[in-house]
Amino acid sequence: MGHGGDGKTSLVESLLNIAGVTDRVGKIADGNTVCDFDPEEIKRKFSISTAVAPVEWNGCKINLLDTPGFFDFESEVQCALRVAESALIVATGKSGPGVGTEKAWAHCEEHAMPRMFYISKIDEENSDYYNSLHKLQKQFGVSVAPIVVPIFEGNRDTVGIVDCVIRKAYRMEGNKRVEIPIPDNMKDRIDQHRAALCENIAELSEDLMERYFAGEEFSDEELIAGIRQGVKDLVLAPVFCGTAATGIGSYALLKGIADYMPSPDEKPVEICEDEKGELIEINCTPNGSTCAFVFKTVADQYGRFSYFKVMSGEVKQDMTLVNKRADANEKMGHIFTVCGKKTTEVPVIGCGDIGAVSKLVTTKTGDTLSMSVRKVELESIEIAPPCYTQAIAPKVKGVEEKISTGLARLRDEDPSFDTEFNPETKQHLISGAGDIHLDVLCSKLKDKFGVEVTLTDPIVPYREKIRKAVTVEGKHKKQSGGHGQYGHVKMEFAPYAEGDYLFQEKIFGGSVPKNFHPAVDKGIREAMEHGVLA
């Protein structure tokens, strides 16, 4: 997570390359990154949806969820947070923590989520790692502790990194990491960082505290275990750094994620109700009753593709699960692991892992799939209501039905926008998180469903109100030979209850024939629809 443009997608590219998932590091400018594969992302050069990118490191599978940084797509971040065990907050060495960094930290606080920091772009001009580190510590507290620090040479050229825990330095040679001696001018600083880490983990237990005050040095293994516990207990936020373009720091970050971030079975147990209304625990155990949570949906003219996380048990190919919300069975059919847009069919998705399935009929983002013997519904995803509205209209007539169908499909994958018809202004309205959000939706309508639309400011439905009673009169005279026509009526208008209408007749002696009365009533009602002034 982090602010837009801070380098999250580029970092994922580097990690995938270092882990051997890809044979080259994609670039956003070239439109060939693994996570920004949507045509809109390639065109706009930024992420608009959460992408899944798994890697394996030291026998540990890590599912990376690359989230958008622009606030218009905040709902994608919320969906990712719902299934993540921990968060990596990215901030740049150039500007330090931004508004997106603050929001990411606030999300972690709200979800009680373990977190680490990564300071990106440390090799770029005007980048200052230690200034950014100081800002992070000042803003988020002493729990922010550096694990990896950069090695600079000459005019602040980044040539490598030092791991303060194991006290080893490395530089990159091509795609390989090579160990080098720690520069003499950095040894004191590395010792200080390591001592600060020891002090932090000493607070985790009385035994560690006694050993710390006795002057006993912790081993590397004890320090790693202590940092992991501190991260899990939310009292420590380790800081890593690097540059995605050269891979400096990427090895250390993968090792840090595997060593310090909690695994799915360490996540707090979820509590929910079964079909009898009894509270039950959902434990991340492979032999438990199958329970999967759908956190993302991709929809087009061909159907849905649903991303899910296995919360308990395992999901097997062709098994049938129950959607308690929709009270419907769903056959899992073919199931896949996903890396960007690439899918690989597998027979089973294990507990704690992320997979995808196609052609679910009733299941939407935020739904739970479980066994028929234990129907459960986990807490869904809380999406902020839309706050920006525009009027949407087709460029050509006759495609209104295609627009409605397309928007309904798009809402399957993006529940953060809404549509409605305003009967007063006769406009179709679309509401989202901002102008970029709505512009992306319109582009998707064109690309996926072949419908071009325009957005305009909605008409303001001004309301008029009669302030006081008034009497008006009208006369009709027509003389063209023979019998002439003459009419003279008076009408009284007066204030009435808000939104209500009362039509009364005060005709005496049939002076105005009754067959004219309904036409007068109808005319008044039509005038009320549009108003007199507005």
Residue map of PLM features:
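Structural and coupling elements of P-loop NTPases
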Residues: 1-534
